[in-house]
Regions:
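Cleft-lining beta-strand/loop regions that shape enzyme active-site pockets
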Residues: 1-146, 183-191, 197-205
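Metal-dependent DNA phosphodiester-chemistry modules and their immediately adjacent helices/loops
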Residues: 108-110, 145-177
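Short secondary-structure boundary motifs at beta->alpha junctions and helix caps
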Residues: 176-184
């Protein structure tokens, strides 16, 4: 809706302002195909020349994107395409080859627990925000005779190499920070501000 679009637009403007135009911002509203296409278009389109990307997963109710996000943001530059002495693009050109950081909150659910877990576990980047409850399972949606009543029945677990399951394993962010009500009503987003600072610090340390 309009309120959501305004919220995303404000966050993108904040990241642009706080980073001096160095970072881009994307929000993954749901772990589904339309959300992935939107993120893909933004990071390889209007943010292609940015030094890093802030990936916001807050308030995401889940779906199935953990593999797609892992592949998209784990690109490693192996060469640059040059046309008559002018750089055209880095390769791979269909993946993000530069630094990124992910923002989470307590309202993340299901695959919005699994996706940040994979992102952190694979060492793609830091996770900033609040812990995410261990809700990574896949469900079968069952509708009753009254079609307004339906339930998601957990049927798929995600087993780790040690034999345990990801479900009930709370994800702890690398940088834990809450958005206080006092700051929220002023329009300030401490989690986003922290993510920008952390990512810029990482980028500058590699120069």
């Amino acid at each position: 809706g309009l309120l959501y679009r305004r919220w995303v637009k404000q966050r993108a403007a904040d990241v642009d302002r706080l980073s001096g135009g160095r970072l881009g911002y994307v929000h993954i509203s749901s772990m589904d195909d339309p959300s992935f296409r939107s993120v893909y278009a933004d990071i390889l389109g209007k943010y292609n020349d940015r030094e890093g990307i802030v990936i916001d997963t807050r308030f995401n109710g889940g779906g199935r994107l953990h593999e797609d996000i892992e592949i998209l943001f784990s690109g490693k530059k192996y060469f640059t395409q040059v046309v008559r002495g002018r750089e055209a693009c880095d390769m791979p050109s269909r993946r993000w080859n530069k630094p990124s950081i992910m923002v989470t909150c307590e309202a993340n659910y299901s695959n919005a627990h699994g996706t940040p877990w994979v992102y952190q576990h694979q060492g793609i980047g830091k996770v900033v925000g609040m812990p995410v409850p261990g809700t990574m399972t896949s469900v079968s949606w069952e509708t009753l005779q009254d079609p307004t009543l339906y339930f998601g029945i957990p049927i798929v677990g995600y087993r780790l190499p040690d034999g345990s399951y990801l479900e009930n394993k709370q994800l702890e962010p690398d940088v834990k920070i809450a958005n206080s009500p006092e700051k929220i009503i002023k329009g300030e987003d401490e989690q986003l501000e922290t993510a920008v600072k952390e990512l810029l610090k990482e980028i500058d340390s590699k120069k």
